[in-house]
């Protein structure tokens, strides 16, 4: 009998952007902010993607379509989000499905960020950079995308309706400046600041 080396499972392989973070971004952030320990360096903790489908009350098929598109984009099954209270002006009842969301962590988070920065964002029409004022004061960044068709996983011919999504990048950074530098080093194309 010959012994063969077993290949490592795919889960143990690090994402390209995660390796880049450890090798290049961490030393730059340590130098820039004078951290004394590697554990003090901010890192990306999770990415939350949300699609709100307000018209799901009238057409439940729209929510199913949004869920399948979000699953294609992220590679993960979305959660259905339900309304918290009834609002008669919007013809909305309590606990009615109105959207879906996915939370990405670890390897899938870095893979999504890599695809988002290098493939999806350059496909945005009239793109001049992401707005850098959407930080929340605690080191988290949220941006809105108007069209889901910027992602290469979505087949434009099979999209019944153009819908947008909200993408939140949650970091361990204490300040917005640290989060801005972290995301910029990871390749996030922010608008150029006028000095």
Swiss-Prot record:
GO terms for biological process: translation. InterPro entries: Ribosomal_uL5, Ribosomal_uL5_bac-type, Ribosomal_uL5_C, Ribosomal_uL5_dom_sf, Ribosomal_uL5_N. Keywords: Ribonucleoprotein, Ribosomal protein, RNA-binding, rRNA-binding, tRNA-binding. Signal peptide: none annotated. GO terms for cellular component: ribonucleoprotein complex; ribosome. GO terms for molecular function: rRNA binding; structural constituent of ribosome; tRNA binding. The keyword DNA damage does not apply. Belongs to the universal ribosomal protein uL5 family. PANTHER family: 60S RIBOSOMAL PROTEIN L11-RELATED. This is one of the proteins that bind and probably mediate the attachment of the 5S RNA into the large ribosomal subunit, where it forms part of the central protuberance. In the 70S ribosome it contacts protein S13 of the 30S subunit (bridge B1b), connecting the 2 subunits; this bridge is implicated in subunit movement. Contacts the P site tRNA; the 5S rRNA and some of its associated proteins might help stabilize positioning of ribosome-bound tRNAs. Part of the 50S ribosomal subunit; part of the 5S rRNA/L5/L18/L25 subcomplex. Contacts the 5S rRNA and the P site tRNA. Forms a bridge to the 30S subunit in the 70S ribosome. This is Large ribosomal subunit protein uL5. It comes from Chlorobium limicola (strain DSM 245 / NBRC 103803 / 6330).
């Amino acid at each position: 009998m010959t012994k063969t080396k077993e290949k490592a499972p795919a889960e143990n392989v690090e994402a390209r952007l995660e390796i880049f973070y450890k090798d290049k971004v961490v030393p730059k952030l340590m130098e820039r902010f004078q951290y004394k320990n590697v554990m003090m360096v901010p890192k990306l903790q999770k990415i939350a993607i949300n699609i709100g489908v307000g018209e799901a009350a009238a057409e439940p098929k729209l929510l199913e379509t949004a869920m399948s598109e979000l699953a294609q984009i992220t590679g993960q099954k979305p959660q259905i989000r339900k309304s918290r209270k009834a609002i008669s002006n919007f013809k909305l009842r309590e606990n009615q499905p109105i959207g879906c969301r996915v939370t990405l962590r670890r390897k899938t988070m870095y893979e999504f960020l890599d695809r988002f920065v290098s493939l999806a964002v350059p496909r945005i029409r009239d793109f001049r950079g992401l707005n850098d004022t959407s930080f929340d004061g605690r080191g988290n960044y949220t941006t809105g995308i108007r069209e889901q068709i910027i992602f290469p996983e979505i087949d434009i011919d099979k999209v019944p309706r153009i819908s947008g999504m909200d993408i939140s990048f949650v970091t361990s950074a204490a300040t917005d400046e640290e989060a801005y530098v972290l995301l910029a080093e990871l390749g996030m194309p922010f608008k150029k600041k006028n000095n």
